């Protein structure tokens, strides 16, 4: 399995698949916000940024999968997935155990040199409350679904990093 993951990390297909999944999730978030009129909270915006990190890592990995640039992509992927797990766990706890003493910030805080909320307000402005439950599917709230997604991204990222010392087999996928 590790050789297969190493082989996948050196091809564009797996990186593009990861980019496609992250882009699909971002577009779904925008659908919820602009079509279903759900208000994203501060943690939702940070989770969106972590997902953009996964998307960016996938695009970097797809650019040059056989060069050391893929290691940069793996580091960004690991960091973004880890931060996504942290943020969605915190968001899930705020929704499952609401408290007037534990709340999220009122505004998103981006660095002064990267004011995403001012550059692209349709995507990065928060207007909702983190503890408010706005949507569920099969009994799980949106942060709980994202927690599972980020955990999956993180597990696969760790396995791909572990697989790097193993040499990929020199055959195509059809065994010729």
Swiss-Prot record:
Mutant lacking the gene: phenotype: Induction of the PhoP/PhoQ two-component regulatory system.
Pfam families recorded: DsbB
Spans within the Periplasmic topological domain: 32-49, 90-144
Topology term for the membrane: Multi-pass membrane protein
GO MF annotation, one: protein-disulfide reductase activity
GO biological process: protein folding; response to heat
Disulfide bond annotation, renumbered to this chain: 41-44, 104-130
InterPro entries tied to this protein: DiS_bond_form_DsbB/BdbC, Disulphide_bond_form_DsbB, DsbB, DsbB-like_sf
GO cellular component entries: plasma membrane
Domain of life per record: Bacteria
Its biological purpose: Required for disulfide bond formation in some periplasmic proteins such as PhoA or OmpA. Acts by oxidizing the DsbA protein. PhoP-regulated transcription is redox-sensitive, being activated when the periplasm becomes more reducing (deletion of dsbA/dsbB, treatment with dithiothreitol). MgrB acts between DsbA/DsbB and PhoP/PhoQ in this pathway.
Family: Belongs to the DsbB family.
Name under which the protein is recorded: Disulfide bond formation protein B
The organism of origin for this protein: Escherichia coli (strain K12)
Gene from which the chain derives: dsbB
């Amino acid at each position: 399995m590790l050789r297969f993951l190493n082989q996948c990390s050196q091809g564009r297909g797996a990186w593009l698949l990861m980019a496609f999944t992250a882009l699909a999730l971002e577009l779904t978030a925008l659908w919820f916000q602009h079509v279903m009129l759900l208000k994203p909270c501060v943690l939702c915006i940070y989770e969106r940024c972590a997902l953009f990190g996964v998307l960016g890592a996938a695009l970097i990995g797809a650019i040059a999968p056989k060069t050391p640039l893929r290691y940069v992509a793996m580091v960004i992927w690991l960091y973004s997935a880890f931060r996504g797990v942290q943020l969605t766990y915190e968001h899930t706890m705020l929704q499952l155990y609401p408290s007037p003493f534990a709340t999220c910030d009122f505004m998103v805080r981006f660095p002064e040199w990267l004011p995403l909320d001012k550059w692209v307000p349709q995507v990065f402005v928060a207007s909702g409350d983190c503890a408010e439950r706005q949507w569920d599917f099969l009994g799980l709230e949106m942060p709980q679904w994202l927690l599972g997604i980020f955990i999956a991204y993180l597990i696969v990222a760790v396995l791909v990093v572990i697989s790097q010392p193993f040499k990929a087999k020199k055959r195509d996928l059809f065994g010729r």
